[in-house]
Every structure is written in C-alpha cells, then in structure tokens.
C-alpha cells in the first residue's frame, strides 16, 4: 500500500477523546497507521525578532525587474511603511488575531534588505510575494500542506519560496517527514525551490554569522 496515496483523517480536540474512543478507532481494520499531526512554528520562544526598519529605509525603491521570492510565513501587514512597495502580491490564509505579522515582517525584511542587515548576504534585493499561511502560535502540518498547494498553484511564475519555520520536535532520523515529502512533490510538480530553515539555535554561546574559518 502506498501510504502517500491513502486518505488522511484529521482528528481535532484530542484532549477530549477518551481511551475507549481511541481504542475503538484504532481497532478499525481499514486504519493502517495513526500519527499525531505535527505543529509547525515560526520561531523558538525567547528569540528576539528585529524587523530592521532603519535598514529598509536606506535602500532604493524596488525595480520591477528584480526577482520575486514567496515568503510563506505570518505575513506582512498591509500598508507597512517600509515594505509595502516591495510586496508584489498577497495570498492570505490567516487573519488577525491568529497572526500578529511579526515574524513574517522580519523575514520579508531579510529578503528585501538582507545585505543591509547582514553584510554576508548578497547585495541583490528581491521583491516579495506575501503568503500569510502560518499562525503566530503554530500551525498543523496538514493545514500548511493545503495552503502551500494553493499558494504555489496560484502563482506558477514565482519559483522560490522561503519557509522560515520548523517543528516543535525533532525529525525522524530514518525517514522523511510527511511535510518534507509534500514539499518534494510540490517542487517536482511546479518547479519551485523551497528554502527551508534548518532550525533555531538557542543555546549559549550563540553562534555568530557568517561562520569564520576558525
């Protein structure tokens, strides 16, 4: 049985399920596998987010010939003083109060003015396709996969998609996650390059960037 083609059943409010209810479900002969739906978050608690408004104010207005990067995150608020002219379009799946736009604004700032904020970044700025697809407190993987499928199909001309997000638990060391498999399938179907964060490093001492030879 190809599990990637099997229908998925999403169970919500699991804290309200009794052991008898779960036993009854798991005893169904048509159920092959049951896994908890992973929650994906934009950043680790305690990590400060710097939007970089000063650096954005120093760069020239966007050129229509510059490339476009889809930023799939918590979104950029409409009318943002520094970023609004850089946003070429919006796909909105999440609205306030489920998003506060903080992390998405910070990531979009790096796409637009990365070199001004980090000298090791390329000098070439990019315009932004703002995809508000992530709740500020985290999203279920199944929701993210659906939103990504919709976003990619709506803008086939955008070939780079930034995903500065990660799971609250580590990945399985022996197999790719459902989310990773979905990204591979979307990449192969639409020719999109997904740039995915490797994780947040919160231990002391904090790592510097860019990495030196020593």
Show where each model-derived region lies.
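Substrate-binding/access-modulating region of protease and related hydrolase catalytic domains
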Residues: 134-214
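Autoinhibitory propeptides
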Residues: 1-60
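Short, flexible loop/turn elements at secondary-structure junctions
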Residues: 15, 38, 75-76, 132-137, ...
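Subtilisin-like serine protease catalytic core
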Residues: 57-90, 94-142, 189-191, 204
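Plant-biased detector of terminal regions, especially N-terminal secretory signal peptides
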Residues: 35-46, 62, 70, 123, ...
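Hydrophobic beta-strand segments of well-ordered beta-sheets in folded domains
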Residues: 6-11, 33, 68-69, 126-129, ...
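Hydrophobic, Leu/Ile/Phe/Ala-enriched alpha-helical segments that form helix-helix packing faces
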Residues: 1, 21-30, 111-118, 148-152, ...
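Catalytic cores of nucleotide-enabled group-transfer and carboxylate-activating enzymes in metabolic
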Residues: 21, 50-52, 59-60, 105-109, ...
């Amino acid at each position: 049985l190809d599990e990637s083609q099997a229908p998925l059943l999403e169970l919500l409010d699991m804290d309200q399920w009794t052991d008898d209810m779960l036993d009854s479900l798991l005893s169904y002969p048509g159920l092959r596998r049951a896994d908890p739906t992973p929650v994906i978050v934009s950043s680790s608690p305690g990590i400060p987010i710097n939007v970089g408004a000063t650096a954005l104010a120093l760069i020239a207005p966007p050129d229509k010939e510059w490339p476009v990067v889809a930023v799939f995150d918590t979104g950029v608020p409409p009318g943002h003083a520094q970023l609004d002219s850089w946003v070429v379009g919006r796909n909105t799946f999440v609205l306030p109060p489920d998003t506060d736009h903080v992390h998405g604004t910070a990531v979009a700032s790096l796409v637009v003015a990365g070199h001004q904020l980090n000298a090791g970044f390329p000098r070439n700025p990019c315009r932004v396709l703002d995809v508000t697809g992530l709740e500020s407190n985290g999203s279920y993987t199944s929701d993210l996969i659906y939103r990504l499928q919709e976003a990619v199909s709506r803008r086939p001309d955008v070939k780079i998609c930034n995903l500065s997000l990660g799971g609250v638990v580590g990945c399985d060391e022996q197999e790719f996650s459902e989310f990773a498999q979905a990204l591979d399938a979307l990449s192969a179907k639409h020719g999109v390059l997904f740039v995915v964060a490797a994780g947040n490093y919160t231990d002391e001492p904090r790592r510097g960037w860019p990495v030196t030879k020593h």
